[in-house]
């Protein structure tokens, strides 16, 4: 049983799925044109038609497959989805006299979708078309000053629509509205971490049988959690390989070992730093660095696979957003290969096991909590596959990495100490190749400049630079130049994404 979300191109479609899951209902995203047969495979108890950039009156406007609107389940249309419901039922949709973008107050609201909601209702609008004539059987259930039809319902056919985005945080009571839709659908709201873990373990055991599984551990939350889940499901038939390429943060290898081994993960750690740093010698171009690191990882991983094999399966931490991004027109997914293991030779062509392919990142973090993964790893900020190589601008050397590791450790430890870490989506230190004149005591210095960066974001597609307190930044600068003598200048990056990327390389 699920709620199927048909995606017509809205940037917020994933948020709809996440909000419904947070409310305890399993939800699945399919292309807006998914066939009736494909939708039926999900056994839907409700359907959501997402927003999108198209206009329903255009000849090439996307539309659900024939028969979808005839299904005997409640349907909620959001923005474009509402306009489509109205248009298909005989109503009129036209270019709005005044476009609405941003927050708007509902001047009135009611009906089944708004049951139990009281007080001011702020909604996030983003539309240039409006329903100008209601189809037969529908009633207006919401309006704003500029949009007289901001919500519609037909309680007989159980068709509902809103001309705003209930899934975004800018619609504070949107969660209550979505919960009301789930009540209308009669969905069993039993989708929770405990339920997920039990199902995943059974699925793994069923798929793997008596086979052996190989997993690459990066030290991040996804692969670490996957290691714990697989260890619980199949025990020592899992071999997890952690490649230390010398580009990790200070103490990271020891932290991963201390977190996973006591919890039963059969973990193999490999020090391949000499190979990686040797291959990176003299290389300054960031794209070249990435390619070299990817190549060396494959070599090291292949060597360990042959050493501890044979294996029947390769486990990957593919997440649901990866599946959505690579889905074809009928929802068939060609899953992206994990950046670390996508180039293995054909004779190591394992079958894939991807237990997290239907999960979002926040669901994986909750599973990690249940499985006992320490918060230091579970709530860790994202860390790039190439590691510190792309935060050490220019050529990568052991000496420069040692400097960067100490700067990064001071910054990240400081964020935790001051209670600022969890308020940032990602924080990092960069060692620049810039050297400048300074004064330490009575002596002239000519040392490196370190850059600190912290951002806040919901999706990492765009990001704001974090407004960290001046006192904190002053403290970090003071600690860094006093404890890392190779640094005599610290700068803070105040550039958003765009125009910059989060990482410097």
Swiss-Prot record:
Pathway: Purine metabolism; GMP biosynthesis; GMP from XMP (L-Gln route): step 1/1. ATP binds at residues 218-224. One of its GO terms (molecular function) is GMP synthase activity. PANTHER family: GMP SYNTHASE [GLUTAMINE-HYDROLYZING], GMP SYNTHASE-RELATED. It comes from Deinococcus geothermalis (strain DSM 11300 / CIP 105573 / AG-3a). Residues 191-380 form the GMPS ATP-PPase domain. Homodimer. The keyword Nucleotide-binding applies. Pfam families: GATase, GMP_synt_C, NAD_synthase. Keywords: ATP-binding, Glutamine amidotransferase, GMP biosynthesis, Ligase, Nucleotide-binding, Purine biosynthesis. This is GMP synthase [glutamine-hydrolyzing]. The active site is at residues 79, 165, 167. One of its GO terms (cellular component) is cytosol. The gene is guaA. The keyword DNA damage does not apply. Its EC number is 6.3.5.2. Residues 2-190 form the Glutamine amidotransferase type-1 domain. It catalyses: XMP + L-glutamine + ATP + H2O = GMP + L-glutamate + AMP + diphosphate + 2 H(+). Catalyzes the synthesis of GMP from XMP.
């Amino acid at each position: 049983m699920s709620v199927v979300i048909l995606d017509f191109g809205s940037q917020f479609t994933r948020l709809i799925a996440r909000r419904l899951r947070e409310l305890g209902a399993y939800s699945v995203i399919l292309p807006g044109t998914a066939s009736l047969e494909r939708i039926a495979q999900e056994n839907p108890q409700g359907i959501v038609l997402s927003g999108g950039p198209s206009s329903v009156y255009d000849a090439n406007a996307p539309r659900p497959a024939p028969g979808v609107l005839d299904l005997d389940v409640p349907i909620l249309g959001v923005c474009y989805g509402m306009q489509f419901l109205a248009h298909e039922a005989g109503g009129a949709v036209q270019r709005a006299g005044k476009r609405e973008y941003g927050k708007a107050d509902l001047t009135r609201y009611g009906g089944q979708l708004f049951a139990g909601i009281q007080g001011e209702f702020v909604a996030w609008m983003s539309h240039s078309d409006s329903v100008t004539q209601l189809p037969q059987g529908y009633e207006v259930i919401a309006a704003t000053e500029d949009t007289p039809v901001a919500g519609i319902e037909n309680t007989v056919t159980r068709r509902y629509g809103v001309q705003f985005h209930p899934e975004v945080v800018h619609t504070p009571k949107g969660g209550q509205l979505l919960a009301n839709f789930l009540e209308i659908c009669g969905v069993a709201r039993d989708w929770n971490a405990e339920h997920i873990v039990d199902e995943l373990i059974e699925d793994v055991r069923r798929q793997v049988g008596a086979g052996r599984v190989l997993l690459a551990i990066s030290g991040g939350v996804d692969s670490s959690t996957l290691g714990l889940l697989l260890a619980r499901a199949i025990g020592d038939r899992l071999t997890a390989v952690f490649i230390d390429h010398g580009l990790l943060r200070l103490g990271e290898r020891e932290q991963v070992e201390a977190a996973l081994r006591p919890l039963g993960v059969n973990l193999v750690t490999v020090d391949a730093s000499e190979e990686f740093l040797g291959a990176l010698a003299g290389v300054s171009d960031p794209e070249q660095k990435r390619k070299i690191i990817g190549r060396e990882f494959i070599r090291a991983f292949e060597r360990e696979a042959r050493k501890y094999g044979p294996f029947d399966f390769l486990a990957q931490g593919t997440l649901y957003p990866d599946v959505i991004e690579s889905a074809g027109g009928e929802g068939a997914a060609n899953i992206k290969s994990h950046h670390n293991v996508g180039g293995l030779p054909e004779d190591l062509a394992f079958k894939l096991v991807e237990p997290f392919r239907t999960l979002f990142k926040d669901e994986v973090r909750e599973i990690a909590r249940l499985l006992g993964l320490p918060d230091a790893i579970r709530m860790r900020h994202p860390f790039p596959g190439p590691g510190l190589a792309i935060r050490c601008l220019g050529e990568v050397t052991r000496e420069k990495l040692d400097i960067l590791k100490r700067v990064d450790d001071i910054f990240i430890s400081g964020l935790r100490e001051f209670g600022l870490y969890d308020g940032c989506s990602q924080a990092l230190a960069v060692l620049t190749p810039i050297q400048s004149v300074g004064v330490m005591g009575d002596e002239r210095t000519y040392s490196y400049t370190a850059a600190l960066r912290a951002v806040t974001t919901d999706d990492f597609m765009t990001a704001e630079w974090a407004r960290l307190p001046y006192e904190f930044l002053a403290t970090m600068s003071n600690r860094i130049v006093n404890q890392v003598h190779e640094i005599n200048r610290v700068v803070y990056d105040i550039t958003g994404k765009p125009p910059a990327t989060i990482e410097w390389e």
